[in-house]
Amino acid sequence: MSEIPAIEVLDLQKSFGENKAVQGVRFEVKQGEIFSLLGPNGAGKTTTISMLSCLLRPNDGDARVMGHSIRSDQMGVKSVLGVVPQEIALYEDLTARENLSFWGKMYGLRGSKLKLRVDEVLDIIGLRDRAKERVSKYSGGMKRRVNIGVALLHKPKVIYMDEPTVGIDPQSRRNILDSVVALKNEGMTVLYTTHYMEEAEELSDHIGIMDHGKLIACGTGEELVKLVGQQTRIDLTLNGDGANVMSLWRDIDGVSRVFAEDGLVSVLVTDSNLVLPHLFEAAAKLLIRITSVDIREPNLEAVFLHLTGRALRD
């Protein structure tokens, strides 16, 4: 008998008035894997998480978490689920230990079992040595780590993490990413949302790319990169007006796309070694000097650009 999926999403739809926030999203997450929903702000990631957490009721479709329907068995869903929201849901005047103890009691833990689990969670989030300090004294990254700890208290089989590294320092970000991997190593299933391409690439077994409420691609990182073929992106800084040279570059063999972004001119090519000399030659004809060159191999940013026509951070 095959293992049931940890999460099975079946054509979820959610609208707010005329705004179609989620449109027919369908994907499956295997038990014990990290699945990332990658997309820009407003793509529908948080709305999807809210429906999968039973906080929002879908207009249509369904989903099952460890076999429990979000429509007909919400208590079953909540019994196997931990949720780390974007917002910090802590009592600032309490210490980290007191916060975890409070929420542990909400999950029904008492006495020695509560203390043991709080200690375990403090070790997981790396804050045992700061556990007696008030949360109000913590950095944003430390607060987010306690937020994660709250979601782990009842040992859920599945955990949702909604943009957990937004607005925090690099060290805290590294700690959170390491903790995500540690959770997977303990057999937990993680559904992770982010707009940081490098996080999705580093963490994920499978990645779903969302845009304007739709899941536009899904697969392993390697499978997704194959969608753009072997295209390489060349970012160039020009000393002069780039409009005319961009027109010349578009006619060069091996160039598939030329566009301007963030003060750079970007060129998508099949072979950078063959094309680059021709880029310099065309620029020289117009007396335009190329002052910097950055060659970037295919990645999820290129996939998003290929699928939507714009950069992930737009």
Model regions and ranges:
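Catalytic Walker B motif of ABC-type/P-loop ATPase nucleotide-binding domains
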Residues: I159-D162
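Conserved ABC transporter NBD signature motif
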Residues: G61-S72, G76-V77
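ABC transporter nucleotide-binding domain
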Residues: L177-T270
